[in-house]
Design a protein with these regions (language model features):
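Conserved nucleotide-sensing/catalytic segment adjacent to the nucleotide-binding pocket
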Residues: 19-51
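Short acidic, glycine/proline-rich loop/turn micro-motifs
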Residues: 16-20, 164-165
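Acidic, Mg2+-coordinating active-site environments of NTP-dependent enzymes
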Residues: 47, 56, 65-167
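Switch II of P-loop NTPase G domains
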Residues: 52-62
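Short phosphate-binding/catalytic loops that engage adenosine nucleotides
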Residues: 2, 43, 123
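Short beta-strand-centered segment that lines the nucleotide-binding/catalytic pocket of NTP-utilizing
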Residues: 2-15, 50-51
Length: 167
């Protein structure tokens, strides 16, 4: 396999090397330093959790994203954004990024329609649903158990059984 860096709430991780973080998404200078360091180490892919704060503050300006994933809006960040509308606008910035090739969108979330409309022209959109919404990838026959959830994933690429220890 090829090395992949991970940046998020738990810090910046590459294999067993973990650097703690004070923010989900580092400030712009620290982020660019981390990406440059990993590039010098041969890393060609990074999975990054990008907060709405970071989008609003320009912390990821200059970063070209190949894929963006939208999960949901919650009330967690209203203290910063002031309204759900402002929070949503901040999230949309990621999907309007030049160079975006793929957008993965939670069709179960009410804001999904606005996200899909904001996706930059030419990007492939894949939707997913755990609640039966019309989507490209759907959870079917979900069975919630004490140890987690199991079910089937139906998609244009086929059907697969899954088990997740997360409820």
């Amino acid at each position: 396999g090829k090395p992949c860096g991970v940046i998020g709430t738990l810090g910046a991780t590459l294999a067993d090397d973990v650097a703690a973080a004070s923010n989900t998404t580092p400030d712009a200078v620290s982020l660019q330093q981390q990406l440059a360091q990993w590039l010098a180490q041969g890393v060609r892919a990074v999975s990054m959790e990008v907060s709405s704060h970071a989008l609003e503050q320009g912390r990821v300006n200059g970063v070209e994203f190949a894929t963006a994933i939208y999960t949901n809006l919650s009330h967690d960040h209203l203290d910063y954004h002031g309204s759900m509308e402002a929070y949503g606008r901040a999230k949309l910035r990621l999907f309007a990024s030049a160079g975006l090739q793929h957008a993965v969108i939670n069709a179960d979330d009410p804001f999904a329609v606005q996200v899909r409309a904001a996706v930059v022209a030419g990007a492939q959109v894949v939707t997913y649903s755990a609640r039966g919404a019309a989507a490209d990838v759907r959870v079917v026959n979900a069975q919630f158990q004490a140890g987690g959830v199991r079910g089937e994933l139906h998609s244009p690429w086929g059907v697969a059984n899954f088990f997740s220890p997360l409820p």
